[in-house]
């Protein structure tokens, strides 16, 4: 049974009903409707912590979806699942693919920065200063790009860039 038919949560049910209505009224082809249904089910599974099911749905949505922007959001959600599972390199690969399709996704840039910062902290704890510096530099680069796209967001990242001296002046304008 499709996930959309077995939701017990009121919010999930409401989202599913609204999504189904939108699918019925929007003039779109059957393949796009199927892709959205898989994407919707993937988001629902992800929200329930059912990551394997979420990935299956996202992979099917990605196979069906033709719109580059929509594909970018599918890849973004897949990356979130991989990151939640501690598969940081796989998450970074998905984020890179999402950016290749839509370079104006500050949330992707932010999440890539978070992963690199995390990996930098781990390297620092292990005494691997070169790797830590490399990861922190990557984090700074991704956060700087995210802040340029969304200047009012990522305040903690802005503070980190300032306190570590890794940010350039144009990021704070």
From Swiss-Prot:
Gene Ontology CC entries for this record: plasma membrane-derived thylakoid membrane
Pfam families: TPR_12
Locations listed in the record: Cellular thylakoid membrane
Alphabetical list of PROSITE patterns matching this protein: TPR, TPR_REGION
Gene3D superfamilies for the chain: Tetratricopeptide repeat domain
InterPro entries linked: PSI_Ycf3_assembly (IPR022818), TPR-like_helical_dom_sf (IPR011990), TPR_rpt (IPR019734), Ycf3/AcsC/BcsC/TPR_MFPF (IPR051685)
One Gene Ontology biological process: photosynthesis
SMART domains xrefs: TPR
Main location (coarse class): membrane
Membrane topology, from the record: Peripheral membrane protein
Keywords assigned by UniProt, alphabetized: Membrane, Photosynthesis, Repeat, Thylakoid, TPR repeat
Domain of life per record: Bacteria
Chain positions of TPR repeats: 35-68, 72-105, 120-153
Coiled coil: none
PANTHER family assigned to the protein according to its UniProt record, in alphabetical order: CELLULOSE SYNTHASE OPERON PROTEIN C (PTHR44943), TPR REPEAT-CONTAINING PROTEIN MJ0263 (PTHR44943:SF8)
Similarity comment: family membership: Belongs to the Ycf3 family.
Function: Essential for the assembly of the photosystem I (PSI) complex. May act as a chaperone-like factor to guide the assembly of the PSI subunits.
Name under which the protein is recorded: Photosystem I assembly protein Ycf3
């Amino acid at each position: 049974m499709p996930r959309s038919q077995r939701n017990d949560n009121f919010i999930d049910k409401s989202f599913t009903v609204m999504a189904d209505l939108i699918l019925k009224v929007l003039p779109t082809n059957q393949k796009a409707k199927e892709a959205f249904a898989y994407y919707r089910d993937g988001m629902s599974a992800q929200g329930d912590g059912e990551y394997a099911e979420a990935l299956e749905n996202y992979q099917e949505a990605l196979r069906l979806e033709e719109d580059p922007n929509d594909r970018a959001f599918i890849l973004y959600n897949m990356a979130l699942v991989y990151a939640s599972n501690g598969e940081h390199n796989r998450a970074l690969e998905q984020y890179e693919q999402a950016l290749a399709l839509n370079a104006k996704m500050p949330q992707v840039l932010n999440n890539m920065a978070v992963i690199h910062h995390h990996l930098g902290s781990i390297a620092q704890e292990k005494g691997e200063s070169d790797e830590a510096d490399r990861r922190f530099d990557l984090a700074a680069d991704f956060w700087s790009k995210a802040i340029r796209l969304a200047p009012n967001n990522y305040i903690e990242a802005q503070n980190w860039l300032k306190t570590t001296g890794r940010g350039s002046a144009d990021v704070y304008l």
